[in-house]
Amino acid sequence: KESAAAKFRRQHMDSGSSSSGNPNYCNQMMKRRRMTHGRCKPVNTFVHESLDNVKAVCSQKNITCKNGQPNCYQSNSTMNITDCRQTGSSKYPNCAYKTSQKQKYITVACEGDPYVPVHFDASVFLPATPLPSLPRPHKHRLLWLEGNNSS
């Protein structure tokens, strides 16, 4: 079975290339990376940075994930990414996508040992406030989640 880290690489990493000037980039890549098997994945982001740079995000700005989990991290700088969004008229098995190249901060969820990206959470134009500067209850909850019940 594909590991979460390997799935992240397959679905989100496209180092050393870009989508610029290729309106068919998403149609080609979504198919090539098996995100149109059985259904059309509606939205997906490819990151055009080195795997090392993306792995490094796991030690950058700790923020809350969209699902409320505390193991998300936002990049310190913007990254070259491509957003792929299924067009309204396309239906499986003929998945069609709109390709948009952008420079944005990325947010990934990290897990494991080594601590690596396992989920692409979001991309934004403006950086978020890191978790430690949030009000106190969050700190207690985080400590508790880490199994440190000294509070």
Swiss-Prot record:
<feature type="binding site">
    <location>
        <begin position="41"/>
        <end position="45"/>
    </location>
    <ligand>
        <name>substrate</name>
    </ligand>
</feature>
<keyword id="KW-0325">Glycoprotein</keyword>
<dbReference type="GO" id="GO:0005576">
    <property type="term" value="C:extracellular region"/>
</dbReference>
<feature type="glycosylation site" description="O-linked (GalNAc...) threonine">
    <location>
        <position position="129"/>
    </location>
</feature>
<dbReference type="InterPro" id="IPR001427">
    <property type="entry name" value="RNaseA"/>
</dbReference>
<dbReference type="InterPro" id="IPR023411">
    <property type="entry name" value="RNaseA_AS"/>
</dbReference>
<dbReference type="Pfam" id="PF00074">
    <property type="entry name" value="RnaseA"/>
</dbReference>
<feature type="binding site">
    <location>
        <position position="10"/>
    </location>
    <ligand>
        <name>substrate</name>
    </ligand>
</feature>
<dbReference type="GO" id="GO:0003676">
    <property type="term" value="F:nucleic acid binding"/>
</dbReference>
<keyword id="KW-1015">Disulfide bond</keyword>
<protein>
    <recommendedName>
        <fullName>Brain ribonuclease</fullName>
        <ecNumber>3.1.27.-</ecNumber>
    </recommendedName>
</protein>
<dbReference type="GO" id="GO:0050830">
    <property type="term" value="P:defense response to Gram-positive bacterium"/>
</dbReference>
<feature type="compositionally biased region" description="Polar residues">
    <location>
        <begin position="14"/>
        <end position="25"/>
    </location>
</feature>
<feature type="region of interest" description="Disordered">
    <location>
        <begin position="1"/>
        <end position="25"/>
    </location>
</feature>
<keyword id="KW-0964">Secreted</keyword>
<dbReference type="InterPro" id="IPR023412">
    <property type="entry name" value="RNaseA_domain"/>
</dbReference>
<feature type="active site" description="Proton donor">
    <location>
        <position position="119"/>
    </location>
</feature>
<feature type="glycosylation site" description="O-linked (GalNAc...) serine">
    <location>
        <position position="133"/>
    </location>
</feature>
<keyword id="KW-0255">Endonuclease</keyword>
<feature type="disulfide bond">
    <location>
        <begin position="58"/>
        <end position="110"/>
    </location>
</feature>
<feature type="binding site">
    <location>
        <position position="7"/>
    </location>
    <ligand>
        <name>substrate</name>
    </ligand>
</feature>
<dbReference type="GO" id="GO:0004519">
    <property type="term" value="F:endonuclease activity"/>
</dbReference>
<keyword id="KW-0378">Hydrolase</keyword>
<feature type="disulfide bond">
    <location>
        <begin position="65"/>
        <end position="72"/>
    </location>
</feature>
<feature type="binding site">
    <location>
        <position position="66"/>
    </location>
    <ligand>
        <name>substrate</name>
    </ligand>
</feature>
<dbReference type="GO" id="GO:0004540">
    <property type="term" value="F:RNA nuclease activity"/>
</dbReference>
<dbReference type="InterPro" id="IPR036816">
    <property type="entry name" value="RNaseA-like_dom_sf"/>
</dbReference>
<feature type="active site" description="Proton acceptor">
    <location>
        <position position="12"/>
    </location>
</feature>
<feature type="disulfide bond">
    <location>
        <begin position="26"/>
        <end position="84"/>
    </location>
</feature>
<feature type="binding site">
    <location>
        <position position="85"/>
    </location>
    <ligand>
        <name>substrate</name>
    </ligand>
</feature>
<keyword id="KW-0540">Nuclease</keyword>
<feature type="disulfide bond">
    <location>
        <begin position="40"/>
        <end position="95"/>
    </location>
</feature>
<comment type="similarity">
    <text>Belongs to the pancreatic ribonuclease family.</text>
</comment>
<feature type="glycosylation site" description="N-linked (GlcNAc...) asparagine">
    <location>
        <position position="62"/>
    </location>
</feature>
